[in-house]
Amino acid sequence: VVGLAAWRLGDYTAAYDAFDNVARFAINDDLKAAGLFWGARAAMATQQPQLMQSKMHKAAQLSETFYGLLAAEALGMEPIARKVAKVGKLDWTSLQNQPNVILAVSLVEIGQNKLADTALRHQARIGDVRQHGNLAQLAGALNLASTQFWFGHYGPSRDQSTSTARYPLPNWEPTGGWRVTPSLIYAHALQESNFRTDVISPAGARGLMQVLPGTAQGLARARGFSFAAADLDRPAVNLEYGQSYLEKLRDLPITGGFLPKVIAAYNAGPSPVARWNSEIRDNGDPLLFIESIPFWETRGYVAIILRNYWIYEMRENKPSGSLKGLAQYMWPKFPDANGTVTTRRMTGGVVAAR
């Protein structure tokens, strides 16, 4: 807060000191990377390029953070996350004689996915820890995304074979087909539900993308479709309403189709974003806008979704236009169905397309 306040006032020396303290005393990698990245910006603003380079390189090592990915892009480095995203092949021969594995496969074949989840997790608890990476890949092959995610977070420490499992890529498709790039949809599903298809929030939001039944009902009515809340437990239906709502937010004047604002509206609703448009003095800087969002949950949500989105693009070996744009302090627009992103630089209220 102190650093950002000084930054807005143009006191970059005070901002540098504040951001340096954030980086040194951070309690987690996300906060440390943020302190390093903004410290690097302040170092450049105070004409200390050697300090800028040092801080950017340190931030880039925190490869699974929002600012770590931005730092790597700004330096022209291949992100560590892209190197790790290369998935090995499933070694079925080492698993095919394990009863719990055979049971899980059989259960998936008859549509009993929750029981299959239980069987694979039980095998992980009683089996050879060296098989966790293989079991994670099997969970992915069986479309057991929540269990694959579980392996990614509860597998052996520092095991890179399960790091990709933290970002499942299930073979699902919305009922109306993909109109929004899957990387962005899965980025939301990961944060909203950890890919649990039947989870219900205290507010009543349901399923993968935590869609509110009232929101889905309105979208269905506009299309002349029938709707039942229980349908949101089905991946294809939930993804359809989730992407439809993102499209609706994209087309609202208050978001301008800019990706960070669409993501913020998905979390907080359109009305707060409309208010922030007039209250936040971001000087055309998208990163300053994100850090100035007054709702701490939404502020963190935007960074997490973008981080997830970029890593999904890396998993699919795709370029990331939004990452490239934000690393140059430009506003990324909402991606098209192929994931292509255009960016715009906004300075003093003037929008210059690039």
Give the label of every model feature segment.
Residues 83-112, 322-323, 327, 336-339:
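Acidic, serine/threonine-rich low-complexity intrinsically disordered linkers/hinges in large eukaryotic
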Residues 64, 97, 113, 128-129:
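Alpha-helix initiation and capping sites
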Residues 13-23, 76-89, 111-120:
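Repeat-mediated protein-protein interaction surfaces in helical alpha-solenoids
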Residues 3-5, 41:
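Tandem amphipathic alpha-helical repeat scaffolds
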Residues 64, 76-80, 310:
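Non-catalytic alpha-helical coupling and interface elements of nucleotide-dependent molecular machines
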